[in-house]
Amino acid sequence: MTNQILSNDDWGRYKKEGFLVTKFGDLTDYVMNWARSGSLWPMTFGLACCAVEMMHTASSRYDLDRYGIMFRASPRQSDVMIVAGTLTNKMAAALRKVYDQMADPKYVISMGSCANGGGYYHYSYSVVRGCDRIVPVDVYVPGCPPTAEALLYGMLCLQNKIKRTRNG
């Protein structure tokens, strides 16, 4: 029997003598995480030159729609925040406020050297040395600026991380 949601290995693990033997929570976690990972809606928080590469990722060449990734402008409609660029002390409060407005579960991708650890401006008095000091980060994308392929790979890594998550 072929199942659309479970792979053959998972189906073989859950199947025993024609019955589906599992804890109800395991199966619901699997289905929920499968659905969540296939419909990521990132919100852009472009702060510097990395935002240009983020826009490049949204273009037709990379076609994020085929992965279920659609950019949203509102934090209430998105579940992923992409922090792209240098985070200053003045923008840190706005970043946290926007993050708090997102619905749970919410994920953060830190894109570029500046968002990861301050980058070129690390020693400046007005730069936060990594957005992980303000919001919890799930995936770090290195580079200055990282390529569109690197951001796409980071999104795919986030999808895999969501699939492996246990909800309860």
Curated annotation (Swiss-Prot):
Membrane topology term: Peripheral membrane protein
Q: Which InterPro entries match?
A: NADH_UbQ_OxRdtase-like_20kDa, NADH_UQ_OxRdtase_20Kd_su
Q: Which domain of life is it from?
A: Bacteria
Q: Which UniProt keywords apply?
A: 4Fe-4S, Cell inner membrane, Cell membrane, Iron, Iron-sulfur, Membrane, Metal-binding, NAD, Quinone, Translocase, Transport, Ubiquinone
Instruction: Give the principal location in a single coarse category.
Output: membrane
Q: Which cofactor does it need?
A: [4Fe-4S] cluster
Q: Name one GO cellular component term.
A: respiratory chain complex I
Can you tell me which residues bind [4Fe-4S] cluster?
Answer: C49, C50, C114, C144
Q: Would you tell me the protein name for this molecule?
A: NADH-quinone oxidoreductase subunit B
Q: Which organism is it from?
A: Wolbachia sp. subsp. Drosophila simulans (strain wRi)
